[in-house]
Amino acid sequence: MPTINQLIRKGRKSKVSKSNAPALNFGYNSYKKVATNNPAPQKRGVATRVGTMTPKKPNSALRKYARVRLSNLIEVTAYIPGIGHNLQEHSVVLIRGGRVKDLPGVRYHVIRGALDTAGVEDRRQSRSKYGTKKPKK
């Protein structure tokens, strides 16, 4: 517990909040070859590797992921939600923040139905989250 004198001399420091999706906070100036402060809700990137990984205990599955080089030259691992996907190396994808709790190091999601990523086939519920068009009657 600080004394009144210590508080007068130093004051209280406000806590600095840390981003859960740090790669979305930067841009890149290709002329000056320098990172810029350009936060965005989503970023475009190119898939450099597409594969599967196994989750932490106690879960068991083959979760689909893509290693993505973003437009700001940061490389991140993004989860591909939904059943089945059409991504391969050099696909252009849009990513958003949002971690996958049982995959260590995965802090981003690929947005389905945007750019080269197709929506989930035959999806009836929660379609907007998976980029699926409204089915014909």
From Swiss-Prot:
Keyword RNA-binding on entry: yes
Keyword annotations: Ribonucleoprotein, Ribosomal protein, RNA-binding, rRNA-binding, tRNA-binding
GO biological process assignments: translation
One Pfam family hit: Ribosom_S12_S23
Any one GO CC term of the record: small ribosomal subunit
SUPFAM superfamilies hit by this protein: Nucleic acid-binding proteins
Cited InterPro entries: NA-bd_OB-fold, Ribosomal_uS12, Ribosomal_uS12_bac
Assembly and interaction partners: Part of the 30S ribosomal subunit. Contacts proteins S8 and S17. May interact with IF1 in the 30S initiation complex.
Described purpose of this protein according to its UniProt entry: With S4 and S5 plays an important role in translational accuracy. Interacts with and stabilizes bases of the 16S rRNA that are involved in tRNA selection in the A site and with the mRNA backbone. Located at the interface of the 30S and 50S subunits, it traverses the body of the 30S subunit contacting proteins on the other side and probably holding the rRNA structure together. The combined cluster of proteins S8, S12 and S17 appears to hold together the shoulder and platform of the 30S subunit.
Name of the protein described by the UniProt record: Small ribosomal subunit protein uS12
Protein source organism: Lactiplantibacillus plantarum (strain ATCC BAA-793 / NCIMB 8826 / WCFS1) (Lactobacillus plantarum)
Gene name, Swiss-Prot/TrEMBL: rpsL
